[in-house]
Amino acid sequence: MSAPSAEEAAVLATLDNQGPALLQQVEGWSAINSGSRNLDGLARMADTLAEAFRPLGGQLSYRDPASASSVGADGRESPLLHGRNLHLVQRPEAPIRVLLTGHMDTVFAVDHPFQGVTRLDDNTINGPGVADMKGGIAVMLAALKAVEASPFAAGFGYEVILNSDEEVSSPGSAPLLAEAARRVQAGLTYEPAMPDGALAGARKGSGNFSAVIRGKAAHAGRNPQDGRNAIVAAGDLALGLATFPKRRPGLSANPARIDGGGPNNIVPDLAILRFNVRPSTTEDQRWAETAMAEIIAAVSAEHGVEIELKGGFGRPPKPLDANQRRLFDLVRACGADLGLDIGWRDTGGVCDGNNLAACGLPVVDTLGVRGGAIHSAEEFMLVDSLVERARLSALLLMRLAQGALPAAAAAAAGASA
């Protein structure tokens, strides 16, 4: 690629003075608590975003989440409710089609003390979701508005999905994401870039599990030998899972919580072990699935308990393969044309980009603002990155509209449909 053409430069110039308006937009959105379990807040956030995206035109709709469930402390599954998702479709018959995704939910519950936005200095704000990822949604919208008002708009179609459950692994929106991924040639997701501007490259996968362990109650003093201690079995299972990193380098397992037990004089007959497994590759994932089954069988036999495993790998591993690199190279070239040196680093974190890549779609999933300390009360966004990253996305969209995505990447995406 070369420096932006005169036509591209004219579009980019429309973004140059939008910094104050974009900052005000992010601050307003951050003031709406949209924690993943705050359905009222998510509904308000969805309505607010619908009004913001409606001027783009196209078909805008609310999409109900798929059914999901969770395992309670009693070992029983119950329905788990999620908010509705926003879906915008623009020019679906265009020969070049792009999927842009973001999430309206945050990790901060309605009763979390971290609720306000604070300006730390002229270029830094602190607030819930400012980086992850309400700032990213603002970047996405600004870029789309700029390109939509340009001659380049006729060259491509796009879909936008803003889901309500990304922070809890997208159980209600995963089918919607997969359907859309199979209709397009490239995916752009607006998770925050790193403070230095680097993007996430390869990502580990992630699986969340609940092992429901049922033993046998007995009196702890009179006849403990007749009991089958579910808590002890859960501990044994946790220790077995903790060996995964040594047995399979690159794979991590985190036994996170044990629910169960009761009075001190009763052998506990129920325990729920909750754990997370993160594989680097699909081979790691298959190894983990086999190893989990083996450990569960061994613990069950050793302790005389029944173990039922719930959950699964909701985020497949996302390797930085040749298909992904072609889109990364295009982003890097666009950045260079704007004076940005864009690199990437592998990460153990996961996002909807994992799911899109699993559909065969080339995807760059950290096109949002530069920021950091996400998932904490120190979360921050660098203000100058709003315009910087909006310009990057706008140029990327214009290049995609002109057919810049290498044929091999587009063909791979189409083959997965």
Task: Describe every region a protein language model picked out.
Residues 83, 94-98, 114, 121-122, ...:
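Short coil/turn connectors at secondary-structure junctions
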Residues 133-204, 246, 401, 405-411, ...:
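Acidic/histidine-rich catalytic neighborhood of metal-dependent amide-processing enzymes
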